[in-house]
Amino acid sequence: MPISSTEQQLLVFIMLLAGVSAIAWLIMSRLMRIAPSASLRFSVANMLLIAGISILFFRQPDANLVFWQGSDLLILLAFVALKAGFLALFKRPSAIKADIILLLVWSILALQVPDNAKEHWLGLLFSAFAFISLGSSTVILYQASASSFKRRYAVGVAAPLAGISLLFLLRFVSSLVIAPHSMAAVHQGKSELYWAYLVFVLLVNITIFSSTLVRLVAKIRHLADRDQLTGLYNRFALNRKLAQLQQLHSRGRCGGEVKCTRCRAV
């Protein structure tokens, strides 16, 4: 299939965007030392996206199964690195073992795909794993943001990644419903796919930047809430903690009243 100039321009722009992002996060990790562990993972995620999309650009429908798996595996590894970056950024326990197990399951299932329908079934498996990985990253990002800010701000931070996850879920469901030969006709052109990856790379790096900003602001707020010499909380921090304690106390009292009512009924 001949490669159009539009596809070439889209690929160059994607490579430029992901490459600049990878270099920027690497500088933040090594030189500026801003969240070094998380920034390094974000840089690796962008590098893996560059490699995976580059292989995807030269992939043809008649390519062998290993070539198909190579591009998908690199992009899925980018999703794993992205999730690991969020976990490191917000000081959460690592989930690399679970991600490796899922990747092994994906690889085993992908090897069982017949050659005459590899585009359909590999796309279905790719969408399923992408939804699981990005969906869990969305949950991590929302929970970490909601612990420091109001829920509407946490929703705004996690919304781009949640939208991407839902798109992969929609693709998975459509792959189940539409016949394999129809899906091949739908994905015959690559321009739409490159536009999707361009938006994806842009939204992912915006989400990474916003999550890093959330973590930075939360850390500054935590340092500002307490006096570094005496360890005492300031007036605003005390008011927030008193409100939280009052809310917990009211919940416990309501729970106790419900239990007492049930006991009396018995």
Predicted regions and their residues:
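Juxtamembrane segments at transmembrane-helix boundaries
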Residues: 19-39, 51-184, 191, 207, ...
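Hydrophobic alpha-helical transmembrane segments
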Residues: 195-208
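Hydrophobic transmembrane alpha-helical segments in integral membrane proteins
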Residues: 1-20
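Conserved nucleotide-binding and Mg2+-coordinating catalytic segments in signaling enzymes
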Residues: 221-243, 258-266
